[in-house]
Each structure stands twice: as C-alpha cells, then as structure tokens.
UniProtKB/Swiss-Prot annotation:
Domain MGS-like: residue ranges: 1-147
Classification via Gene3D superfamilies: 3.40.140.20, Methylglyoxal synthase-like domain
Catalysed reaction equations from the record: (6R)-10-formyltetrahydrofolate + 5-amino-1-(5-phospho-beta-D-ribosyl)imidazole-4-carboxamide = 5-formamido-1-(5-phospho-D-ribosyl)imidazole-4-carboxamide + (6S)-5,6,7,8-tetrahydrofolate; IMP + H2O = 5-formamido-1-(5-phospho-D-ribosyl)imidazole-4-carboxamide
GO molecular function, one term: IMP cyclohydrolase activity
Keyword Transmembrane attributed: no
CDD domains, per the entry: IMPCH (cd01421)
SMART domains: AICARFT_IMPCHas, MGS
Gene name linked to the record: purH
Name of the protein described by the UniProt record: Bifunctional purine biosynthesis protein PurH
Family of the protein in this entry: Belongs to the PurH family.
C-alpha cells in the first residue's frame, strides 16, 4: 500500500472535484492538471502544476495533444517494484504519478442532440483521457485511478485510515471499473460512427456493442438446472422492472422478472382510469378498468381466477389499502407492482412476507423508443420495440360498431398486443372475459377464450373480440358469432379478407381493421 504523492486530475464532469482535490492537497499530494480543470482548481485556491510544465512540452493542435507524452505514461506505467523500470524512469527524468482522476468528453450527450454534426461528434471523442485511464488501470498495483465522482469519498476515507495510501484491493476494483467505462465509451462511438459508414445514416450499424451491468445473481434461471443473473442497462430513463424499488418480499426470480416486465409494460397502455393487469407466464390472464383500483382488481381477477393464482399483479396508480387487502385476503400472488405504494398498503402486504412488493415510479404517457433483442443460437435479432398501437382504423362491415363497442374494441386491442400469438381476447365493459393465448391456430385461440369465459361464469354474449393478426379463414368469425361476439377488431391483410368480412356481415357483426399487426413470440 503506497502513499499517494502526485495526482493528475482532468475531468469533464466536475462534480465534487474541488472538494476532493482540497482533501488530496491536505495529504500533501501534488496536483497536475490541464485546461478548464486546472483553472477551476486554481480559482478554488489550490496549487496546480500544468501538465505541460510537468512534461516540458506544450499543449498543441487545439488541445488534441495534452497528456500523450512519455513523462505522463511512463509515470503511470512504470512499476515501482521493478528495478529496471525505476532505473529507466530515473534516466529519462520520469517522475511517478500515483493517482489519475479523469472522466471523458461527453460523446453520448453530444450525439444525443438532434442537430449533432459529424464534426461535433468527432471533436467529442476523447483520446488522451482513455489512454491515461487505461495506463493507470493496467498498473493498478501502483496507481489509483478514478473515473466516477461517486468513488471520491470511498478513496478519501481509505486515505484517512491509512495515512494517505490506497489499498491494492481498492485499486484493482477501480481499475476494473475503468475498463468497463472505456469499453462502454468506445462502444458508443463505434455504434454511432458505424451507422454512418455509407450514404446517410443506417438504422442499424455494421457492428453493435452494448454494455449491461450485473444487478442480481439468481438461485437459478427459467428452470432449476439453469444458472442465471439479471443485468441492467446504463441510465434507464423510464419506469421499468430494471429501475423498480423492491419494498419487501423474497428475491425476484428469473421468471418473476420476465413476468413483471410483461405486466408493467401492459398496464402502461391504460391511462383512462384505474386499471389492473394480472399476468401468468408472461400472458395477461385478466385486465380491467374500474372505478378505483379495488374495482379494477376485482374485475381483472374474475376473468380467470384459476390462472391468477401465483400471478403477477400490476396497477397504474398508487396501491391503496383496499386493493392491497383484497389481494392478500383472496389469493396467492408472486409480485405486486405499482407506481407508488401507500404506507397502509405496505403494512397490509407485509403480513405476507414472501410477496414481492415493487414500486416503479410513474411512467410517461408515451414510452421512449428502444431496441428489442432476442438471442438465437449464434446471433442476435434486433428490432424496434413495438410501441405503436394501430394504424388507420377502418370499419369494413356493413354495420358500424356502436360507441360502446368501439370503446371495448380499443380496450381489447391493447390487451391483445401483449398476449402471446396467436392471440384472441374477448372483452366487455372495460374488462377481459376470455383470453386465448399461444395457439398454433387462431380459431383454437378463439375457442379457448370462450372456454375460459364459460369456466369463469362470464357472459360472452354482447362482448367484442380482438385478434393480434388477421383471420386466415372465416372459421374464427363463425366461432365467435356462435358464442355471442358482436364486434371484431383485427389488422386485416389476409388473402381472404373479403370472405372474413362477408362472414361478419352474415352474422350482423361490426368489424374494424387496424392496419397494424401485433405478433408476440
């Protein structure tokens, strides 16, 4: 554990840097710096030596060359315990640098601006910063390297305890963080420039680099014989399973996380009133809008009480005492998630200590565009996440849907978007009454939806039907008519659309085309 005698500080994000530098100076640490950082530290009353004075070589090329010098990198890479290194450093007048505090030009923030030019992007590619970070991290046995202001206090506390030194264990952890940081930085540059290698801007670059951070180890994966872990993106900007706060309960499992994500993304579709989504095996088994959250939960539960057992329950408003009590008294539940949880509701759920209670914060009315990825053997499928709802709505039957039917059609359409294909959803009065999911034939999904409704004691007559994709034959319409469906919403686009529309007309049904498919696999 060597004492810190000299630190090179050059940061774009100057959060906390003055106070940190003052405490370093208190240990007698000599501070080297450049540009705006040096100016800021001097204005704060600190003694600072310019890097150009340290190297005996001026900054040049509009600041592009500041720290790219043997006296800097020799001072970082020279191994203090290697006699040949020490002799070489002495022969060339290279003095050791014991600490590097650097963060990088804000490339990602720059290219996120809608008017960012290629020239602006290139000028915000840091060269000297990553080079110093990597040199210092490589020689972490002798050099402390900081890239994150959140680590300043940890290092200062350790220096206080050890008389101005930092342990090798801390140095190693900080070095790993540096390589993670520079990998993400280079990945962002590669992704952005890689989309501009031809004419115009490609939607997807030639190579794709992502970085995820391990958030949680797991007992097992989808099945007990599979190992697993949960990784999250950097800087997630909307309410999600990745950012949700767990208030109580057992650790989230692999399946819990996947199912809760499905429930949360589904409930985000509903903002016209209190709503509840119940999910089992990533499929909504009950969705409803109600006068309040208790009413919404009651109605969602009634769709399929059997499937709701051991399910995931999501709400679009603050979980209150009444809804929490109804859940705890009525059923076994794995996860409850809501934007907010009242203190009283939290107390009630605490009676079931294993129930995982999550608070995710309120989401925006419109979700942020993002990529959806699916791993296949030897590759990765990448697409834009399906955030759209429908294209042009077109009534294609002789009969127009009533106002009430249209409200229910749009309700069931939103649910169908989150049901595994082939998906059929029956609904009435802002409530699902039957969900047919994941069948290889669409007509069988329709039959299952009817069976589910009958089993739950719900009246199908007068309900509407949503289908995530077109009907290839008229049998799905005939089947729906037999159980009392009065209106249908579907994308359209089948070779047999005319036959399907004719079937709806024969049964006196209204049919709306959405011009948009929502397969979900």
């Amino acid at each position: 554990m060597a004492k810190i005698s000299r630190a090179l500080i050059s940061v774009s994000d100057k959060t906390g840097i003055v106070d940190f530098s003052k405490e370093l100076a208190g240990y007698g640490v000599e501070i080297l710096s450049t540009g705006g950082t040096a100016k800021l530290l001097r204005e704060a009353g600190l003694a600072v030596k310019d890097v150009s004075e340290f190297t005996g070589f001026p900054e040049m090329l509009d600041g592009r060359v500041k720290t790219l010098h043997p006296k800097v990198h020799g001072g970082l890479l020279g191994m203090r315990g290697n006699s040949e290194h020490v002799a070489t450093m002495k022969a060339h007048g290279i003095e050791p640098i014991d600490m590097v505090v650097v963060n990088l030009y804000p490339f990602e923030a720059t290219v996120a601006k809608p008017d960012c030019s290629l020239e602006d992007a290139i000028e915000n590619i840091d060269i000297g910063g990553p080079t110093m970070l990597r040199s210092a991290a490589k020689n972490n046995a002798d050099v402390t390297v900081l890239v994150d202001h959140n680590d300043y206090r940890k290092v200062l506390d350790e220096m206080k305890q050890s008389g101005g030194a930092v342990s090798s264990a801390t140095n190693f952890g900080l070095a790993v963080k540096v390589y993670q940081h520079t990998a993400a930085y280079d990945g962002a540059i590669s992704n952005w420039l890689g989309a501009r290698t031809g004419e115009g801007v490609a939607e997807y670059p030639d190579t794709l680099t992502f970085q995820f951070k391990k958030a949680q180890g797991m007992r097992y994966g989808e099945n007990p014989h599979q190992s697993a872990a949960f990784y999250v993106e950097r800087d997630v900007k909307e309410a999600s399973i990745a950012t949700a706060l767990q208030l109580q309960g057992k650790e989230l499992s692999y399946n819990n996380i996947g199912d809760t994500d499905a429930a949360l993304e589904c409930i985000k579709q509903f903002n016209e009133g209190p709503a509840c989504v119940i999910v089992k095996h990533a499929n909504p088994c009950g969705v409803a809008i109600g006068a309040n959250l208790l009413d919404a939960y009651d109605r969602a539960y009634k769709t399929d009480p059997e499937s709701a057992f051991g399910g995931i329950i999501a709400f679009n408003g603050e979980l209150d005492e009444a809804a929490a009590k109804a859940i705890v008294d009525r059923q076994f539940v794995e996860v409850i998630i809501a934007p907010k949880v009242s203190a009283k509701a939290s107390e009630i759920v605490a009676a079931k200590k294993n129930v995982r209670l999550l608070q995710c914060g309120q989401w925006q009315a419109e979700s942020l565009a993002r990529l959806d990825m699916k791993r296949v053997n030897g590759g990765l499928l990448v697409q834009q996440t399906d955030l759209s709802l429908h294209g042009e709505l077109k009534v294609v039957t002789k009969r127009q849907p009533t106002e009430k039917e249209m409200i229910d059609l749009l309700f069931t359409w939103r649910v169908a978007k989150f049901v595994k294909s082939n998906a059929i959803v029956y609904g009435k009065d802002g409530m699902t009454i039957g969900v047919g999911a994941g069948q290889m034939s669409r007509v069988n999904s329709a039959r299952i939806a009817a069976i589910k409704a009958e089993h739950a004691g719900l009246q199908v007559a007068g309900a509407v039907m949503a289908s995530d994709a077109f009907f290839p034959f008229r049998d799905g319409i005939d089947n729906a008519a037999q159980v009392g469906i009065t209106a249908v919403i579907q994308p359209g686009g089948s070779m047999r659309d005319e036959e399907v529309i004719a079937a709806a007309d024969e049964h006196g049904m209204a049919m709306v085309f959405t011009s948009m498919r929502h397969f979900r696999h």
